[in-house]
Amino acid sequence: MLKKIPNILTIGRIIIVPFFVIAFYLPGFYGDLTAFALFVIASFTDFLDGMLARMMGEESKLGELLDPIADKIIVAAALILLVMSGTIKHYEVIAAIIILTREILISGLREFLAKGQIKLPVSNLAKLKTFLQMFAISLLLTGETGNKILNFQDYNAQTIGIILLWLSAFLTLYTGYEYLRKGIDHAISEDEKN
């Protein structure tokens, strides 16, 4: 199982996390650049591992288990670091909490449904949410370096990142509600059978 390329990419994404955390605390340009690069690599492998698994016919139970865990670890680490550093602050923290809460709830829901052999397929809207979330976090990780490079009048990398974070938080609420509704419908139908 570990020899399968998609699984190696997924495990690599988990291994990146401690290096990402260390890079986040490196000062200045190189710290910003390294943390940004590691997060972008992790985000890209999230897209790549699933695509390769389907293309190569290498979908596996291990990949199915580890992929969502790897996603949540890197996103949670990034959001927590961005809040702790003050990059995400004040009311913006609500967006981060919405994203983290949804991830925990949906993980629990998927586990519950898996017991009944029910899978929740990922919707296109959820894929868009993930893309916006990763893009927002990537921009926020660029720090002052990103603000100097990406600056359109009143909109710099941080401002655009916060706007995209809120947009992904709203999509998070919507897609989370959709998944929760499907899960509740399934639970009710199972109760009625018994």
What residue spans do the PLM features occupy?
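C-terminal membrane-associated helical module and adjoining short loops/tails
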Residues: 1-7, 17, 27, 35-43, ...
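Active-site His/Glu-centered metal-binding helix of metallohydrolases
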Residues: 15, 44-52, 69, 73, ...
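Residue-level signal for threonine
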Residues: 10, 60, 123
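Residue-level signature of the transmembrane alpha-helical core
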Residues: 14, 37-40, 69, 97-100, ...
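Core segments of transmembrane alpha-helices
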Residues: 12-17, 70-79, 106-107, 129-141
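Hydrophobic alpha-helical transmembrane segments of integral membrane proteins
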Residues: 2-3, 11-15, 64-67
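Membrane-embedded alpha-helical segments that form the functional core of polytopic membrane enzymes
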Residues: 16-65, 78-98, 156-171
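Membrane-water interface of transmembrane alpha-helices
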Residues: 104-112
